[in-house]
Amino acid sequence: MARKDNKGRNLKTGEYQRPDGRYEYRYKDEITGKRNSVYAADLASLREMEKKINKDMDDLLITDASVKKLTVNTLFERYMATKNIKERTKKNYIRMWDYRIRNTLGNIRVVDFKTSHVRTFFSALSDEGLAHSTIKGLYGLLNPSFELAVEDGIIRKNPVTGTFGDYGAPAKEKEALTLEQQEKLLKFVEQSNVYKPHLPMMQVMFGACLRVSETIGLTWSDVDMKNREIHVGGQLVYYEGDEGYCFHDSETKTDAGIRDIPMTQMVYDAFRKQRELNLMLGLQSNVEIGGRSGFIFNTKHGRPIMPAGVNSFLKNIVNAYNKKESKLAEEEKREPELMPPISSHTLRHTGCTRLGENNVNPKVMQYVMGHSDAQITMNVYNHIAEKSHVENEMSKMNLPETVPAVV
């Protein structure tokens, strides 16, 4: 005999009317096997809920109540648990999430998350002046997290996919120093009593196109002076670990980062000068990091130079150069030719540019740079080729001063 409610209406399987008059629907989630209940004030509302539950189960979605409460923050934690990435990279991702997402989008339930949420979020970040690359990084955390929710049967469709567009301020184009600027800067450093100790390191970064983390991570065992090769097999990174902020020995950024770079004469001479400097100034490495010792570029305390320290002395060098150039230009009654701001990456980018200007094969450039993606190298190569082509074409416009009259 069919069960009825207090109005005499037949109740379907799983439907119940409670003593307080409210309606309940009991069911078992087919994926998790858990029993669940939903409640409504009237039978019509309950049956609308039943339709949605049955549709979800037909689509192989999890209907378990606890899963429905899953927040975006918890989803991200699940996603991170699936990633086999370096500890430093994981910490960077979590730091980015905590700073921008945890207290904004993070508390929204995954099943309630809409495309409008993320578009509004990105738009607000754009209004704050965040860079395009920063917003792209946040998209790179949100999108795969929600993709995991789709794969796990929590939601039908990823609400984040396709939302990343032109949000954020465009990245400034990375400018390499011209050959003239490079030569002037190195000459200034060589003639400076204050900055001359930094000359070998700068020459190595220019000539070998190394990342700053690779440069400060070089040990004397990585440098084969006999065969004139640099063996790049790791890097030093500075970040917060279990013991606070300190250096960590790390693998190269990608497998392509492991490489043997032939030394140019400038680089070979730079290593010889650095060895002499270390002996003369007492800049001997006295630390062991990750089982490695004998670091080449050190502070007066015998520890490797921090990346921020490299950028700091580069900034000071440019400021000193520009101060001297401005004074000289004033004396010579001309406009000063100032050096643009530079960073450690400028030296690497400039070195890559010199390779391109000398028509080094793009595949060789990719190998020297340690790029896993050939497109990164080609972007630099094509920029150089395009600039050279434009200059060559425009040079055709240099007509003689006296142009023959057309008869």
Regions found by a protein language model. Give the residues of each.
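Short, polar N-cap/turn motifs at the start of nucleic acid-interacting alpha helices
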Residues: 222-229, 360-380
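Short, basic (Lys/Arg/His-rich) helix/loop patches that form interaction surfaces
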Residues: 12, 128, 187-198, 208, ...
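C-terminal catalytic core of Y-nucleophile DNA break-rejoin enzymes
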Residues: 38, 42-43, 231, 240, ...
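N-terminal core-binding DNA-recognition domain of tyrosine site-specific recombinases/integrases
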Residues: 29, 38, 42, 68, ...
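DNA breakage-rejoining catalytic core of tyrosine-based enzymes
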Residues: 111, 155-157, 168-187, 233, ...
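N-terminal DNA-binding module of tyrosine recombinases/phage integrases
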Residues: 10, 17-116, 277-292
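C-terminal secondary-structure termini that scaffold catalytic or DNA-interacting sites
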Residues: 227, 238-240, 245-258, 265-267, ...
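Catalytic-site neighborhood detector that most strongly recognizes the C-terminal catalytic loop/helix
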Residues: 168, 176, 236-238, 369-394
